[in-house]
Amino acid sequence: MKITAIIPARYASTRFEGKALADIMGKPMVQHVYERTAKASLVSEVIVATDDERIAAAVHAFGGRAEMTSRVHETGTDRLAEVAARLDSDIIVNVQGDEPLIEPAMIDEAIKPLAEDSSVMMGTLKTRIKTLHDFLSPNVVKVVTDWEGYALYFSRSPLPNFRDKWNDLKDEAFASRKLLCYKHVGLYVYRRDFLLQFAQMSPTYLEMAEKLEQLRVLENGYRIKVVETDYESIGVDTPGDLEKVLERLKK
């Protein structure tokens, strides 16, 4: 079984232009993501998908593989699918290009359900919410699942909505596991053919309302396997986030 991890990386970014090439202890951020992804035991190969020659050149400079893509893609999934269509891989992993601290074990955790069960078309991760701030924040995507670990819904709103427990919503309640709530970790695994099918689906109502692309899958009647992980990463959206990464690496 051939499993390819693809890292979409753009140069243009509203909040942090050129972040894929931001220096982190002597290496561009995309190199950190690439090298950590390559350490996942289930990954056969790693490819950076980019629309910018500067990023491609940086990847080639450290010996990595980069594939050029169109500049007109509206989503990272479209960029992913363009590259996946050129490959003969069985499974495609979408690793965010702005997570230089991603744990290789997280990637393996997300891949495992698809590697073991041919009926699983798509998978992702969740981790426990530990603070009230994260539970209430629209920037933290929440997920609820059924007893078999398949997603019921993703939302920027609090999930679940504790009708009779608002007075119990305190940090200690989340930390003590009195309230079990989960945030979505944006790492996706697809069967290649399903990814290409997904990219052809039209945007859906709930997807556009929540601005969450994965809802398109649920609205079209497909299932997403969600695996719980104890690992957490830091997404770099701003220069301030980059400082947090540097602080953690120095410890």
Curated annotation (Swiss-Prot):
Its EC number is 2.7.7.38. Pathway: Nucleotide-sugar biosynthesis; CMP-3-deoxy-D-manno-octulosonate biosynthesis; CMP-3-deoxy-D-manno-octulosonate from 3-deoxy-D-manno-octulosonate and CTP: step 1/1; Bacterial outer membrane biogenesis; lipopolysaccharide biosynthesis. SUPFAM superfamilies: Nucleotide-diphospho-sugar transferases. This is 3-deoxy-manno-octulosonate cytidylyltransferase. The gene is kdsB. The lineage of its organism: Bacteria, Pseudomonadati, Thermodesulfobacteriota, Desulfuromonadia, Geobacterales. Pfam families: CTP_transf_3. Coiled coil: none annotated. Belongs to the KdsB family.
